[in-house]
């Protein structure tokens, strides 16, 4: 049976993860300090499905490299249509490395058919993305972690790809997103021809 694509993604203002280091304003009398001070380039996109949700947001590595985080979380009760809550306290988070970011961008923008990003952190977290034509297949997993699997609408995937492309270009002063797209396209062609990247594992 075919999986129903997830609902269209949209920007959601959700407080960042504990492992994100956005500065918080000093508390003043009676003021609400729940919302962190985010950089002007911060963007967060979400896609919600029947069993889990996926989210991409802009981030920076400890070395200051502009990249994206991929987060996934299970739905609290998939059998209750009225329950729209997702358990972000049980989420899986992966931050794309300097070398992974252009490959993820290539997959999300239709330049590579799939990719696998693994061995992240102590739990050996893994992200797989496959362009299936009608939609994109997303999967996160890891040692001792809940596996999150869902189809993501093509429109959402291209929104994610545009975010990743913009972050990639931001690392190179004066590089336009158009030029960055040309670089990533050339990279994707060579990686595909020479087998220089990890494709997603074949689903059985």
PLM segments and residue spans:
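Positively charged, low-complexity terminal tracts
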Residues: 1-204
